[in-house]
A protein has these predicted regions:
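A structural boundary/capping signal
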Residues: 1-188
Length: 188
């Protein structure tokens, strides 16, 4: 008999989504669902004594591997790429209307509430609410012109979010001197 087989990233994410889903009522509002996901990821609670947290050893995400979801799942320490991506992946598996949005050199989550309005969620800050005025204060280079142009603070489509993920992966390929980065660019 060999070593026990570890679940793939996909099955691990599916298992996490099932675990979160069991924590809130079937007919719960979107608000209850997103609050439950926040508590699950960033706790702490008795079932999750070691919640996911910001990686203070690499706060700027300079080590490319630290931007990868696989690293975040393994270490439970992430940054402004891996943390919102996990939140969005699990949220979408749960049917919660969440997506990625951007600020200068930063990603965070947008959640569409029961009232149809979008709300910011800052995964790097324990899943706290992060409305646009708060984000504007955090990023002095976030100009009204850039916001008006739609470059920042707009909910991204799935395709735009995929581009953000690919950008992180290309950095990983390049860091490991892999020719897969060139192949990936060609396929895009």
């Amino acid at each position: 008999a060999g070593a026990p087989r570890r679940p793939s990233g996909g099955s691990q994410l599916d298992a996490m989504a099932r675990e979160v889903r069991r924590l809130y009522p079937v007919n719960a509002s979107k608000q209850v669902a997103v609050e439950t996901l926040r508590a699950y990821l960033f706790g702490p609670d008795p079932q999750h004594p070691r919640p996911f947290q910001y990686d203070l050893d690499d706060p700027m995400g300079t080590k490319v591997d630290n931007k990868l979801l696989s690293t975040y799942l393994k270490t439970k320490k992430g940054n402004c790429v891996s943390m919102p991506l996990l939140f969005v992946i699990l949220g979408q598996k749960l049917g919660i209307p969440v997506t990625i949005t951007t600020a200068p050199q930063h990603l965070y989550v947008k959640f569409r509430g029961d009232n149809g309005l979008w709300f910011g969620v800052e995964a790097t800050n324990g899943g706290s609410w992060a409305e646009d005025p708060w984000q504007e204060k955090q990023f002095p280079t976030l100009t009204p012109r850039a916001i008006a142009s739609g470059i920042y603070m707009q909910p991204l489509t799935r395709k735009e979010t995929a581009t953000v993920i690919i950008d992180s992966l290309l950095g990983d390929y390049e860091a490991h001197k892999s020719n897969e980065a060139d192949e990936a660019r060609i396929r895009l």
